[in-house]
Regions:
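Active-site-proximal alpha-helix that buttresses catalytic centers in soluble enzyme cores
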Residues: 24, 31-196
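Extreme N-terminal basic, low-complexity initiation segments
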Residues: 2-8
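Basic polycationic patches enriched in arginine
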Residues: 9-13, 20, 28
Length: 196
């Protein structure tokens, strides 16, 4: 839907940048055996239906857009990974485990795509994990969180209204975010302003 298109925009920007850089290097005959990968990182959820409708849907769209890339998922929340293992016997990878797997597969270029809405605690941990693997790949880059630039707030507000207006009609609508102790908590107030 509209929201998924909005969420996929950062990965397209990042992927195009990586591809242009690779083309530049290849033109000079320096490197020609690029093995590309996209790592989709979400906070995760302990609700299987929600996971299928949202996280898995994004993964399917990314695989369809980039069929020549290795596409893997990772769950940034340790609590969610542990709950998935205990309740569903699913071994979800952490971002570090997924990057290690890609390294073992001989991946050379990685685009890390967080589905995080704000650039908060989880996203900063993800960036730190990616930094630790900088030497393991020829190139690794992390896309922005959904709300990274001022225009992102306007785009997301518009996408939300477009996807919800028929269902909501004239009724009041309450949207909630759980907040964070991180400075990125200000993102919620900025989003509220964009929605007014």
């Amino acid at each position: 839907g509209v929201i998924h298109i909005c969420i996929l925009r950062p990965i397209r920007r990042l992927w195009n940048t990586l591809y242009r850089q690779h083309a530049y290097i290849t033109e000079r005959g320096m490197q020609n055996n690029m093995k590309k990968a996209i790592l989709i990182v979400s906070f995760g959820t302990t609700y299987p239906d929600t996971r299928q409708k949202n996280i898995a849907a994004i993964t399917r769209q990314v695989r369809a857009l980039y069929p020549d890339a290795v596409v893997e998922e990772a769950v940034s929340s340790t609590i969610v990974r542990n709950a998935m293992k205990k309740r569903e016997h699913i071994e979800a990878k952490s971002p570090t485990e997924a990057l290690e797997s890609m390294k073992k597969q001989g991946v050379t270029h990685v685009a890390v795509f967080p589905t995080h809405v704000i650039d908060g605690i989880e996203n900063h941990r993800l960036k730190e994990a990616a930094k630790k693997y900088a030497g393991a790949f020829e190139q690794i880059a992390v896309a922005d969180a959904l709300l990274a630039k001022p225009q992102d707030y306007e785009d997301v507000a518009k996408a939300l209204w477009e996807s919800l207006k028929e269902e909501v009609g004239d009724f009041p609508l309450i949207l909630m975010g759980h907040g964070t102790e991180h400075a990125a908590d200000a993102s919620y107030a900025m989003m509220e302003q964009s929605l007014r």
